């Protein structure tokens, strides 16, 4: 049985001799041939060579031509920022910069890099006749967001008719791209629409379903297979996705595989995923990759399932980790060996973040896969960038790309489970949802207010007036009361001590009175029992 036949049977929901395996090699294939991402994604020759090397190393049943959700956007006038280890990121939105929808035309093969992708598809089809060739296209909602920007979320409420018109145009672009990839020899059209994770089922059915139903119907009429790719916290949309007419749903690690299995089987469609991209494939060891692959196989079963990464493979993914997955797929004995391995992988070291967020400034942490490679991550980072100037000098923000181990440790230490996520002073606030500007500002301001209140509470103090009653003591008390009135403070407790033994406790002798001693209180712990070692550090400051 060829890989192509295996994929076709899996799409039909039938049992195969083994589960088919499709590594989503995009710019990672560039690394395999020594090319950076920009050079790779601009060259049909390099794409052809990179895919050939990936096929040789990873022994797949199917392979994507390319994995770049900016191809259509670039052809339609979006400005791109290129990187050496990631696909490009959209940096400007034509419909937000004076261009109208009437000005746009469905791009042809001569537009942007579309011709490069199609030429690569034709060569890959010819070079690998036994494999299922995937042609990824940008989904209409993600393309619409590239063209308009995050303003689309407000327009869905304020001007739904405009959004429908924009999505209809993006549908036509997707139909054109799908047809061109099919004519170039692709067996599977993968409609990749990660930004749908930002909307709920009702909005999905209102805006996305009508468009993608037409796309999947057209793909089916041309004799090709279709897959709906989604990433992020999109579990709520799986049931409506399954009713769009797609032949397969492919997910990442944010969605439980068992949930997708049940939903897809209800609708008699196949499903794929969801090897962990960063913690396992990028940062783990071959044994970690094999354990993860085996766990996916055990959950998914043997019918209608395609083993794949959760999304486009990171550029620097160690080839040995993907080769280890291929061993699990191809060798039943290897699967048995991995099952028998008793040693557990060591837990990731965790940071002690109990005191995190106690500094004067508010810290906004954005946990991402990589804002240069992941569209939802990019738009979440952009949302924070846009509001940060409102809090200059008060708020600091930083992105934590979990493709780096230290960021992964930080993520697990904060108990973050999904990306992208915004945390404010260590508290998870926005999970896989790009907050509107006003909502984000309100969340940051709320934390600023909380810190201000805590600072006031922690700065309470007592003034001890030492000495017998006298004219000077009366004058001293009057001066203190006037100072408090002028400052508008009432948080200072005033206590008068006139006994010699009480005065002596402060190191003051009778001849030095009247004297004033100020004792300031600092809150050191709330809602927890601090450890002895922590208390010792406090005592050292006394």
Model region roles, listed by residue range:
Residues 32-38, 72-84, 413-417, 509-511:
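Glycine-rich loop at the start of a catalytic domain that most often binds anionic cofactors/ligands
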Residues 424-453, 519-542:
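Non-catalytic, surface beta->alpha helical segment in thiol-disulfide oxidoreductase systems
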Residues 352-391, 456-486:
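Local sequence-structure signature of Cys/Sec-based thiol-disulfide redox active-site neighborhoods
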Residues 393-407, 489-502:
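Thiol-based oxidoreductase modules, predominantly thioredoxin-like and allied folds used
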Residues 412-424, 507-519:
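Structural micro-motif
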């Amino acid at each position: 049985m060829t890989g192509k036949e295996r994929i076709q049977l899996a799409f039909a929901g039938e049992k195969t001799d083994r589960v088919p395996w499709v590594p989503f090699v995009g710019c990672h294939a560039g690394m395999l041939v020594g090319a950076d991402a920009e050079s790779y994604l601009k060259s049909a020759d390099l794409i052809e060579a990179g895919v050939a090397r990936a096929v040789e190393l990873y022994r797949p049943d199917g392979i994507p031509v390319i994995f770049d959700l900016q191809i259509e956007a670039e052809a339609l006038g979006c400005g791109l920022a290129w990187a050496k280890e990631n696909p490009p990121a959209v940096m400007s939105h034509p419909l937000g910069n004076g261009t109208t929808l009437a000005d746009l035309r469905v791009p042809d093969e001569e537009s942007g890099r579309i011709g490069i992708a199609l030429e690569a598809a034709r060569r890959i089809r010819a070079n690998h006749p036994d494999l299922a060739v995937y042609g990824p296209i940008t989904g209409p909602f993600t393309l619409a967001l590239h063209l308009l920007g995050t303003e689309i979320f407000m327009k869905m409420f304020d001007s739904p008719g405009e959004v429908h018109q924009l999505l209809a145009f993006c549908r036509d672009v997707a139909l054109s791209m799908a047809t061109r990839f099919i004519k170039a020899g692709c067996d599977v059209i993968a409609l990749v629409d990660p930004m749908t994770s930002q909307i709920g089922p009702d909005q999905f059915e209102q805006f996305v379903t009508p468009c993608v139903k037409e796309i999947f119907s057209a793909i089916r009429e041309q004799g090709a297979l279709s897959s709906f790719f989604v990433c992020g916290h999109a579990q709520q949309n799986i049931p409506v996705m399954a009713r769009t007419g797609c032949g397969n749903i492919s997910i990442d690690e944010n969605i439980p595989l068992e949930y997708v299995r049940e939903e897809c089987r209800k609708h008699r469609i196949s499903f794929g995923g969801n090897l962990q991209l960063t913690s396992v494939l990028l940062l783990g060891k071959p044994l970690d990759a094999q354990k993860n692959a085996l766990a996916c196989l055990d959950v998914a079963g043997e019918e209608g399932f395609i083993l794949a990464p959760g999304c486009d493979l990171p550029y620097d993914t160690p080839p040995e980790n993907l080769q280890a997955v291929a061993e699990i797929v191809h060798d039943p004995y290897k699967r048995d060996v991995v099952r028998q391995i008793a040693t557990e992988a060591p837990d990731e070291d965790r940071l002690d973040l109990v005191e995190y967020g106690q500094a004067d400034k508010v810290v906004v942490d954005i946990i991402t896969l990589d804002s240069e490679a992941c569209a939802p991550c990019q738009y979440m980072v952009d949302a924070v960038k846009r509001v940060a100037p409102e809090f200059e000098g008060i708020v600091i923000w930083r992105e934590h790309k979990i493709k780096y181990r230290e960021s992964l440790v930080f993520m697990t230490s904060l108990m973050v489970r999904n990306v992208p996520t915004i945390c404010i002073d260590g508290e998870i606030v926005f999970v896989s949802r790009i907050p509107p500007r006003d909502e984000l500002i309100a969340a940051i301001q709320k934390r600023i207010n909380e810190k201000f209140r805590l600072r006031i509470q922690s700065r309470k103090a007592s003034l001890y007036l030492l000495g017998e009653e006298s004219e000077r003591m009366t004058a001293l008390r009057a001066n203190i009361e006037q100072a408090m009135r002028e400052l508008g403070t009432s948080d200072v407790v005033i206590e008068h001590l006139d006994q010699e033994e009480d005065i002596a406790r402060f190191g003051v002798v009778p001849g030095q009175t009247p004297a004033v001693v100020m004792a300031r209180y600092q809150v050191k712990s709330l809602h927890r029992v601090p450890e002895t070692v922590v208390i010792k550090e406090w005592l050292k400051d006394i």
